[in-house]
């Protein structure tokens, strides 16, 4: 074989190779699809994390450290004013004990922090109901003494004289004793105080009369105002 033939064969062998199907355009398309898939997965993962940790989405109502709902002071004030207006036209009474009379419960309505409103009356030391309905009845007395030379039993009772039947009925009653044991004669007597509070809701009729009683009025402590009182509020 001649030298020229050999050179020509080498040149033919070094010619351009045939391109594979797809070429650079196919590679770019695959790269774009890969990037799109990665971004889609990353976005979905981020959204899931935000929802899981409640960074986005509906927020819960704000609560106080004690897990109590915070109260809007404006709404609370409106509620209190509405309740006050609702009670302003209903019968009510709050009477206090006369500190000038010892040894008995004498109720007074013409004193500071005492009142009779919307038909309520104080007659013969009794509160007179002006209309049928549900009423909150309450009363408190305070007993005091020095030592316990003997066993002391104290009672406080609220009674009703109804127009529908003549007999007196006890609505509220309580018994207490300040002395769990007698004070020795050689020991110095210690002062004791025993309050009794009564309260309840009852259906009353127009003309019913309410009174209070204590079994040992000599132990009543009337030294300070606001300690002994009697009241009724229509509901």
Curated annotation (Swiss-Prot):
GO terms for molecular function: cytokine activity; tumor necrosis factor receptor binding. The record marks 34-35, 39-40, 49-52, 79-80 as: Cleavage. A lipid is attached at residues 19-20 (N6-myristoyl lysine). InterPro entries: TNF, TNF_alpha, TNF_CS, TNF_dom, Tumour_necrosis_fac-like_dom. It is a single-pass type II membrane protein. It comes from the Eukaryota. GO terms for biological process: extrinsic apoptotic signaling pathway via death domain receptors; immune response; necroptotic signaling pathway; positive regulation of canonical NF-kappaB signal transduction; positive regulation of extrinsic apoptotic signaling pathway; positive regulation of NF-kappaB transcription factor activity; positive regulation of transcription by RNA polymerase II; regulation of biological quality. Residues 1-35 are cytoplasmic. Homotrimer. Interacts with SPPL2B. Belongs to the tumor necrosis factor family. This is Tumor necrosis factor. It comes from Oryctolagus cuniculus (Rabbit).
